[in-house]
């Protein structure tokens, strides 16, 4: 991974450690292998790291661009339409289908800050229970997936301090924005 993703050695080591602990059977049975948030400005390799992780583990990458889920009604595309709405009988949502097809995957939710706040309820189901239930009652197992959220929260503040003489930031520039978002 370090050969393919430049400048993210610490993040790579943390992810690999978490995966090794999970593979050793030392993780909670009801939770995904790992849940990670990659924060930083555009172009630092957040999405690329997720892609390379899936490639190196030889597992499927299920990528969802969260800018497509900005409106409240678009959240139903992930878990399916509620009963009584058009499309309820057709199929489960995109996320449910991906997890049923590829239970061992890297689940990448790209640019999570652009999604509607209702997405957080779906994330809680995955992170707490290791599964998600669609609107039609179908359950998808997420215990063998690696959940990765990417965000640009705090990047604007970090970029302000990069010109001229300023104190170096120690990677915590987005903590306040992240807490406010969730």
Segments (PLM) and residue ranges:
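AAA+ P-loop NTPase nucleotide-binding core of proteostasis motors
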Residues: 1-182
